[in-house]
Amino acid sequence: MKTKTLLIGCMAALCMSACTSNDNRRVIDVVQEPEIEDPVDNFRHEAQPIALTRSQEDINTRLQDFSLQVFKQMYADKQAGDNVLFSPFSLNVALGMFANAMEGNTLAELLKTMNLEGFTVGDLNDYYQTMLKGIKEADDQVAFSSANSFWYHQWFSPTESYAEKLKNYDAEAYVINPASAAEAAKDINNWVSDKTNGKITSIIEEKQIDELIWALINAIYYKGGWKHEFAEGMTINQQFTTESGEAKQMDTMRITSKFLYQGYDGYGVAHLPYNDGAFDFFVVLPDNGTDITSVIEKLSYKDLLVSDYYTVNIEMPKFEVEYKDEQLLYYLSQLNPNITFNGDEIHMLNFDLTGHEFEANLALEIIQKTYMKVDEKGTEAAAVTAILAHGAPGIDTQTIIDFHMDHPFLYGIIENSTNTPLFIGYYGN
């Protein structure tokens, strides 16, 4: 069961789907427009690139492709009227911790699902040690944090081996007392709220604690200001056409400046940099009359990586979105029908069961909650991914390009030196 909420406070609008909109509409007060900056001399000079080995670059590229495939599954599974927001980075970190709880065929199938055949858990751990350190240092003007935790039933202590592996992810370990389900749920949710600066306040309900054996949780938080800030005086009330064709009036931000842009057959991709340029906000905008589903189907991750500057007239709605998806385990099985998470095997590998018996057939689920707010100042975003194990104990560069987001589109946040996606979203309603 998936839950989605669109927060109307900022009249948000970011999605992916096919709608029509008014063509060639440009409402620009040239007098108020800021001067177009030349990005060549001052763009990204303070960003700190993340240095990956050749093997880590290969892992990174493979994970990017895997992430886009998961997003496509998520989009295909959405209900009409839904907006989608996914954090590939949060999911992949959680799966990295999860992989350390596996061996044999179970591990091999997970790595295959993640597009990482030929790599080991050790390779994945080394990659994430580099990424988790590097991404926090990429831009000192951007607030970014990633935190991990491991929660386990008081009857089952993790083995020294597994506890040592989790140190690769700086995971904090906590004991769950199922006799105090309300307190345990409160502790987990307080941890989530603290690590996301209050943007996501819960990931688990009290009723889920009773049969919870363990939980692996990743939480990330991001806040960055635009390199080219939108002037609040340029924001106007303007029409947005939803995926169903309904016209809605929305607060729409406007700016004309030099941005990275690439036009493709049926859609365009633009990047809006944050602060020192280590991170970009990217948008995939279908041409008027082009169905967004067809764009998503043919979209490859390489299409998001653009390198040429153009003068672009951006019109983007302000928005605030929350999303919850409980079907991530299903999406993984769609990517690899052979994947079978043997909960008993994973449990036996990583816990000292001396003196205790438990019901077999652990049930696993993967839940992700996300949040994003976009306004004239910048972007604030958060994500939490929880892996839960339940059981019973016992173009011409001089041309101005119109890029008007007045119909459904894709969007996200990307780290530039490694092209790692932190968030990918669809806005259409």
Region roles according to the model:
Residues 286-308:
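Internal alpha/beta scaffold segment
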